[in-house]
Amino acid sequence: MTNEIPPLTLGWTIVYVEDPVAASEFYARTFGLAPDFAAPDGSYAQMDTGQTKLAFASYELADANFRGGVARPDPDRPPNVEVTLVSSDVDGATRVALDAGCTSLAEPVDKPHGQRVAYIRDPFGTLVEIGTPM
């Protein structure tokens, strides 16, 4: 049986945080992402990444959207989803992120497939990979 619907595309990724505006300001200041939209009540803020959108939404918005909302970050363990930011200078971008308040999870390293990557955790608990293009 073939799929009878048109192919889907990735529209955006939403990361739930305590303060979406603070998260978007951090990503603008630290990674140079451009703010794209913000809800007047501060419950949602969206960034333009060039290919798709990265958004931040409040836990309260998740609670309002569906029963049970989403899990809050575990301070001892990153979540099971990561945001990957692509840079030609992984080492430099990682230094900037650490200076801005991120926590290092894995220093920049060259992978067998030729990509250079580092793993950090942002101040809001999000797992972030900084990597060269694939």
Predicted regions and their residues:
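Conserved active-site tyrosine of GNAT-family acetyltransferases
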Residues: 23-28, 97, 125
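Conserved beta-strand-loop-alpha-helix junction that forms the acyl-donor binding cleft
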Residues: 17-19
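Polyanion-binding surface elements
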Residues: 14
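Alpha-helical macromolecular-interaction surfaces
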Residues: 22, 91-92
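Vicinal oxygen chelate
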Residues: 1-11, 34-86, 92-121, 132-134
